[in-house]
């Protein structure tokens, strides 16, 4: 059996689905089934209990899964140590990120990676939050960038940064001329919100409820890009993370106004599989992320464009 066979079994187990595991490993579903049947024939035991949906691991299957995982981790560690001996930063950094992490920030990081690690490759895929977690758990991504990160038995969290949230409005909106808003200024205003299935949407709704403010919810979206465009076009105001709107604010397309006494922030974190061994390129990229988070941002007042 080859490393590819071990990886296939690990991927199938993590995905809890034969078709999905085969897709992650880059083989067809029929080829994956044949490889697993061949492994069972060589080992002389059943690895999967196929009578249940989703399938369950047999006792032998659990032992084999631990073996596959340990061998693949040792291979990752070997590659990392070999890179160190060569004194070269090589390899691929696979990142899964939510759409609103800040594409301009990621573009700057990609340029920095190219300058510092010309022999390394950075691959970034933008996904919905639950898909980012799935990509990390199934080892399609080395790192995930998410808001309101949560750890579990498979995933650990590295705190990254906190994005200040403010009211955003089109420059022509009546509130745009104010330097600071009282919570009551938002009452009965047309409001464009994030979907409730997004944590950021629920947190904004909680803030408004606790402040005793009723807004006129006119639209809701599942991504920052569409939401900000609705605000720019005058559909209403919103409360959004300001960092990802810097270009629009600097270009005069949006105005950001702080709310008195509002400490609402959107925490962002870096997630990865527990006991994950990173290649040298990924370690350098992690350090770049930390440096990027530590970079000083303009003060709130400087972000308000009129």
Sequence positions of predicted segments:
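Alpha-helical linker/hinge and terminal dimerization helices associated
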Residues: 42-43, 64-86
């Amino acid at each position: 059996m080859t490393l590819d066979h071990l990886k296939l079994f690990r991927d199938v187990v993590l995905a809890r689905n034969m078709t999905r595991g085969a897709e992650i490993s880059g083989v067809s579903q029929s080829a994956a089934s044949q490889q697993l049947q061949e492994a069972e024939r060589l080992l002389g035991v059943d690895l999967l209990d196929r009578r249940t949906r989703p399938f369950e691991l047999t006792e032998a299957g659990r032992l084999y899964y631990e073996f596959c995982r340990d061998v693949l981790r040792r291979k990752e560690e070997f590659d990392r140590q070999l890179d160190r001996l060569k004194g070269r930063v090589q390899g691929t950094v696979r990142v899964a990120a939510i759409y609103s992490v800040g594409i301009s920030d990621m573009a700057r990081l990609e340029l920095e990676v190219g300058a510092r690690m010309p022999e390394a490759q950075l691959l970034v895929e933008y996904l919905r939050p639950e898909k980012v977690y799935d990509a990390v758990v199934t080892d399609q991504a080395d790192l995930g960038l998410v808001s309101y990160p949560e750890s579990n038995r498979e995933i650990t969290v590295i705190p990254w940064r906190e994005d200040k949230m403010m009211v955003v409005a089109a420059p022509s909106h009546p509130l745009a001329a104010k330097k600071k808003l009282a919570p009551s200024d938002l009452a009965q205003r047309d409001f464009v919100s994030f979907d409730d299935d997004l944590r950021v949407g629920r947190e904004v709704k909680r803030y408004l409820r606790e402040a005793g403010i009723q807004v006129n919810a006119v639209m809701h979206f599942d991504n920052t890009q569409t939401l900000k465009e609705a605000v720019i076009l005058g559909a209403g105001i919103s409360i959004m993370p300001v960092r990802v709107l810097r270009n629009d604010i600097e270009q005069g397309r949006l105005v950001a106004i702080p709310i008195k006494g509002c400490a609402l922030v959107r925490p962002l974190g870096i997630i990865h599989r527990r006991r994950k061994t990173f290649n040298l390129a990924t370690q350098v990229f992690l350090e770049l992320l930390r440096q990027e988070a530590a970079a000083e941002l303009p003060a709130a007042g400087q972000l308000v464009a009129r």
